[in-house]
């Protein structure tokens, strides 16, 4: 019987697709692979409530964050839009306006655009490449147990913001819209529609002579990001529940919609925050110079696995979508 993706898991499927090819999949610590992301209408966004300019901006953030996580300076950005018949020139111009704004903000030197017809809604495909300084490459330390797990911002907010938008869409369609709720949870909604990353983070780290030993962008929840770092470094990792940063209204909204913000942080999507591992000897300097980052855990010996540590000290194995159960042990 043919295996399904749900049985094999995304990560194992990717690994097996490379088996016997003579190629190795570019990993978390790769310095040459371009960053690439595809956004599909109806899967990754809903144009009923997603402003086109925000969509263009977010698409660039998604690939730029991958470059920053690998300590690369943005160089070139390539965008291909699959355009459906329902979209006109003005709408595509609005979307590309968001792309251009982000490209300027993050310092890209080249920007290209291609347009293709689409029968199945809007498709936004973005690829970015960047350059790592030779001195940074030489200085990059080997990942070690006790390296600190440091996150650039709040987690779970994008997933919770999406729930607010979806709930408001249902109300809008039934004629019972609540504008005051959108205002109340605007920070959560903003985390989903218009995520932000620190544009000068690579320069700042290089100037401070703090070079992360590893880094990933949180795209499918913190659990997935930690497991990707664990696979790339060959080490375990411990994340502490009480150290995870949340947006202010996360727990109030979580109670209202019966969603645990911790689960949203661990397995929600599109937070687009950068997770670095910083050598523990750089702790005091990093805390002083990068106060917007939160220290949420540390790398550990491989036998420790990847775990979530509760305030009571219990260690719970991380589970992440796309990973087989044995990969989560």
Model-found features: residue ranges?
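Helix-biased detector of long, well-ordered alpha-helical tracts
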Residues: 1-329
């Amino acid at each position: 019987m043919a295996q399904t993706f749900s049985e094999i898991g995304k990560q194992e499927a990717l690994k097996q697709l490379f088996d016997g090819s003579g190629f190795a999949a570019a990993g978390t610590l790769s310095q040459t692979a371009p960053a690439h992301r595809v956004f599909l209408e109806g899967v990754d966004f809903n144009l009923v409530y997603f402003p086109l300019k925000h969509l263009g901006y977010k698409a660039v953030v998604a690939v730029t964050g991958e470059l920053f996580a690998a300590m690369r300076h943005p160089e070139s950005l390539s965008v291909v839009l699959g355009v459906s018949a329902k979209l006109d020139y003005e709408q595509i111009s609005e979307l590309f306006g968001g792309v251009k704004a982000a490209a300027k903000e993050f310092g890209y030197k080249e920007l290209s655009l291609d347009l293709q017809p689409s029968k199945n809604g809007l498709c936004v495909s973005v690829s970015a490449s960047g350059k790592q300084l030779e001195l940074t490459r030489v200085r990059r330390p080997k990942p070690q147990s006790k390296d600190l797990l440091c996150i650039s911002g709040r987690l779970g907010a994008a997933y919770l913001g999406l729930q607010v938008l979806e709930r408001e869409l249902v109300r809008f369609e039934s004629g019972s819209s609540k504008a005051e709720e959108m205002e109340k949870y605007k920070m959560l909604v903003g985390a989903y529609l218009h995520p932000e990353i620190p544009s000068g983070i690579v320069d700042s780290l290089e100037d401070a002579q703090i070079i992360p030993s590893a880094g990933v962008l949180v795209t499918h929840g913190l659990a997935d990001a930690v497991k990707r770092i664990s696979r790339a470094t060959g080490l375990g990792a411990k994340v502490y529940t009480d150290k995870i940063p949340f947006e202010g209204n996360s727990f109030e909204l979580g109670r209202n919609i019966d969603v645990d913000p911790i689960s949203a942080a661990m397995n929600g999507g599109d937070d687009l925050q950068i997770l670095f591992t910083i050598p523990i000897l750089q702790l005091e300097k990093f805390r002083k110079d990068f106060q917007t980052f939160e220290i949420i855990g540390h790398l550990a010996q491989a036998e420790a696995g990847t775990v979530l540590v509760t305030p009571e000290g219990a260690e719970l194995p991380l589970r992440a979508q796309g990973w087989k159960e044995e990969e989560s042990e």
